[in-house]
From Swiss-Prot:
GO cellular component: cytoplasm; peroxisome
Binding positions (substrate): 73, 195, 321
Residues carrying N-acetylmethionine: 1
Organism: Bos taurus (Bovine)
Essential cofactor(s): FAD
Residue positions binding FAD: 25, 46, 54, 70-71, 248, 473, 482-483
Protein name, as recorded: Peroxisomal N(1)-acetyl-spermine/spermidine oxidase
Disulfide bonds: none
Length: 512
């Protein structure tokens, strides 16, 4: 294999472009490129048998459940996922209403309908609201550190704990109530771990935390499943663009590769697949999850990535947030119940204890969201993040179901509560092409690392020598961890290529 690579030319035919990964970033890039006549030589290489990546809707329990992405966060006109979903007719009337689009949530999770304590009693919702108000006011205060070069303490978790200790000095209740307040706050810490996709808020950097941008709009779901969005994008692509069950082994770049069907032409990139197939290209857009990068950093690129990009991949955080769906024949909750909180009275955010994975992994579960009732079943969706979530993946379905049945019987104070009829769960950490859920800015990293991850290669590339481009939620500095961040990143790299090959190109969608 020769190195150096001449400037790629494809007179009259346009460049050959490969997209690695068929998630929302890869599909968004492909859809945008396919609308331009210069990009007729385009393939999307998807490792699995389905498109969508971390968008994964499954028909189960007599309805559709979201094993992956759940909500459109900030469904309003500034959100491209909302725009596309509205254009394709995939949203309900309430989500489309102007009133819903104008609601400012601050990105905070709403209050529960009911809160159960581990002693089997209901927790006062007034007390829950008081603690939520304190917690989210402190979360909002973290934005004050956005421009700080250095912060003490360095993490969001340590900052929150420091402030909570200060507030505790003014608490006048009895010791039991103070303990319950701390237990509620511990639940809210765990909620924030799910939101951030991290094991602990002590791992999340304080200074850049406020750089994440919250869009207006009350989070909404897709009545027929999030995958309807990726299905619609897929339907707009030429039929030969998607190549399924084609995991990539190594991306060879900065070379000079030839192909028998194109004599006399050289390509700077060669994508080698696990099955031995090789695809030469002028450009490759890599959209694989950061968790996959971390796992395969030493073998996925040849030559290896520049040190600066390797360091960015290592420093940016990438954690696990899983869901556990429980199906019941009859609901034990009230008809208007939307969210059940679970509070463990022996837990406190101020106590740094090693996770008790074997015996208490379920204590990290934040509670359950009530899904709209299906035809013949009633379903709860629980969320759990971090090492406990990853440990849960190693257990059998029977073990998980048994543990959660015991939890529900304990917190409701009803030892006769019927066990769930069935269960479904996500296992994103053990998914080989994902290795987790989504990214966060970890202690020791910053938004600059996400920008470094997004930079194409070679870094000094001029003209059509631009070879390897990067997209995916972890490459978006302000919308990381979201589907709209992923989609925008795919559009960004498509625009980069269109500008390269046709500087006068008219953009088919607003460049948000």
């Amino acid at each position: 294999m020769q190195s150096g690579g001449r400037q790629a030319e494809a007179p009259g035919r346009g460049p050959r472009v490969l997209v690695v990964g068929g998630g929302i970033a890869g599909l968004g890039a492909a859809q945008r490129l396919c609308r331009h006549p210069a990009f007729s030589h385009l393939r999307v290489l998807e490792a699995t048998a389905r498109a969508g990546g971390r968008i994964r809707s499954e028909h189960s329990f007599g309805g559709v459940v979201e094993v992956g992405a759940h909500w459109i966060h900030g469904p309003s006109q500034g959100n491209p996922v909302f725009q596309l979903a509205a254009k394709y007719g995939l949203l309900g009337e309430k989500a489309l209403s102007e009133e819903n689009q104008l609601i400012e949530t601050g990105g905070h999770v709403g209050l529960p309908s009911v809160s159960y304590a581990s002693s089997g009693v209901s927790v006062s919702l007034e007390l829950v609201a008081e603690m939520a108000s304190l917690f989210y006011s402190l979360i909002d205060q973290t934005r004050e550190f956005l421009q700080a070069a250095e912060t003490t303490p360095p993490s969001v978790g340590e900052y929150l704990k420091e402030k909570i200790r200060q507030h505790m000095a003014g608490w006048t209740e009895d010791e039991e109530t103070k303990k319950l307040k701390l237990a509620i706050l511990k639940n809210l810490f765990n909620v924030e771990c799910c939101v951030s996709g991290t094991h602990s808020m002590d791992l999340v950097a304080l200074a850049p935390f406020g750089e994440y941008t919250v869009l207006p709009g009350l989070d909404c779901t897709f009545p027929e499943g999030y995958q309807g969005l990726t299905d619609c994008i897929m339907a707009s692509l030429p039929k030969d663009v998607m190549v399924f069950d084609k995991p990539v082994k190594t991306i060879h770049w900065n070379g000079s590769f030839r192909e028998a069907s194109a004599p006399g032409e050289t390509f700077p990139v060669l994508v080698e697949c696990e099955d031995g197939d090789c695809f030469p290209a002028h450009h490759v857009v890599v959209t694989v999850p950061l968790g996959f990068f971390k796992k395969h950093l030493d073998t996925f690129f040849e030559p290896p990535l520049p040190t600066e990009k390797v360091e960015a991949i290592r420093k940016i955080g990438f954690g696990t947030n899983n869901k556990i769906f429980l199906e019941f024949e009859e609901p034990f909750w009230e008809p208007d119940c939307q969210h059940i909180q679970v509070v463990w009275e022996d837990m406190s955010p101020l106590e740094d204890t090693a996770p008790e994975l074997q015996d208490a992994w379920f204590k990290k579960l934040i509670g359950f969201w009530v899904l709209p009732p299906f035809q013949a079943s009633h379903v709860l969706c629980g969320f759990i993040a971090g090492l406990e979530s990853e440990f849960m993946e190693t257990l059998s379905d029977e073990d998980v179901l048994r543990s959660l049945t015991q939890v529900l019987r304990r917190v409701t104070g009803n030892p006769q509560l019927p066990a769930p009829r069935s269960m479904l769960r996500s296992c994103w950490h053990s998914a080989p092409y994902t290795r987790g859920s989504y990214s966060y800015v970890a202690v020791g990293s910053s938004g600059d690392d996400m920008d470094r991850l997004a930079q194409p290669l070679p870094s000094d590339g001029k003209g059509a020598q631009l070879q390897v481009l990067f997209a995916g939620e972890a490459t978006h500095r302000t919308f990381y961890s979201t589907t709209h961040g992923a989609l925008l990143s795919g559009w960004r790299e498509a625009d980069r290529l269109m500008t390269l090959w046709d500087p006068q190109a008219q953009w088919p969608e607003p460049r948000l």
